Structure formats: C-alpha cells, structure tokens
C-alpha cells in the first residue's frame, strides 16, 4: 500500500480585492513551482494506492492556523493501520519527526527527499547531511559507495543507517 501526500495551490486569476464576486477562503501562498506568492486555495491531498488502484483518501483545504505538518500528522492518526508492508511517499517538507513517527505507528515506512540541513548521527556524532556528505567525499573511500545507473546517468550512493533528530533507525540513501 502506498500513501501519497502532497500539497498544491489551485490558483485564482484575481485576488478577492479585485474580483466582482470574491472567492471565499482564497489567500496568498508561496508557490515553490512559480517561486513567488500565488493567490488561490491551497490544499493537502492524500491518495492511497494498492494493486494499481489509486483512491483519493482525503483533500483538506489548508488553514494557516494549523501547520501542514500537523494536518498530515492528524491524517496519519486517522488513517487505518496498514495490514501489510506499506509506504508513505512525500516530499522533503513532510519528512520530519511528527509525520514520520505518526505514520510508523500506523505501519507505514516513509520514502521521501531529505533536506540537506537534516541532522544525522553517524558514529554517534551530530552533523547535518551536507556536512556528512562532505566528510564522505574527503575520505575518498569508494568502497563505501554503490554505483547506481538511472536512465544512463551514473550516481554514487551511500547507505546511512541510524538516527535522525527524533527518528530512530532511519535508512537514508
């Protein structure tokens, strides 16, 4: 079972102040896609996918009085416990202690991007991902890396197993 979480903005053409018939609950939100403020409704969507069937589990209008993290955490608490090996798919925004641990309680492992400022504890030493990657490159220990080819491009991948801030026994590639 895959649980897919993402947020989006349904853009509107005019702000309420300029519209003849103002749109209720529309607001300005930062669009990472457009890299600027965008006027419209922002929603957090959750899809469940299993055996080729994908269903909309919920779509919640974003309310600025409650963070997106808390909204997704609440969804995780309400979602049924996974009966089989299951995964949460999300972007780096949602890969945080509250969300990951809430989904772990429901039997979901998390697959998502990790921000470079995320804290790891390699060999018990606290450092961010960017710092740790630099140390691995400095060490020039090729045997620590696995060469992976994706669409003809080659990447060196390192597997970290250990703790993140507030998340135990994580695997980071």
Residue ranges and their predicted role:
Residues 1, 12-17, 51-173:
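Single, function-defining residue in the core of a domain
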Residues 1-51, 153-154, 158:
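Active-site-proximal, Lys/Arg-enriched surface segment
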């Amino acid at each position: 079972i895959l649980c897919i979480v993402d947020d989006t903005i349904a853009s509107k053409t005019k702000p309420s102040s300029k519209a003849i018939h103002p749109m209720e609950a529309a607001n300005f939100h930062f669009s990472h896609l457009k890299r600027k403020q965008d006027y419209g409704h922002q929603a957090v969507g959750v899809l469940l996918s299993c055996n080729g069937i994908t269903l909309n589990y919920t779509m919640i209008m974003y309310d600025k009085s409650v963070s997106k993290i808390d909204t997704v955490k609440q969804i995780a608490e309400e979602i049924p416990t996974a009966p089989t090996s299951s995964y949460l798919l999300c972007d780096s925004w949602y890969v945080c202690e509250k969300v990951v641990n809430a989904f772990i309680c429901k039997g979901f492992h998390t697959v998502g991007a990790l921000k470079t400022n995320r804290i790891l504890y390699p060999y018990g030493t606290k450092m961010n991902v960017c710092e740790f990657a630099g140390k691995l490159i400095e060490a020039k220990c090729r045997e620590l890396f696995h060469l992976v080819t994706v669409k003809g491009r080659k990447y060196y991948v390192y597997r970290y197993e250990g703790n993140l801030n507030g998340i135990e026994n994580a695997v980071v590639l």
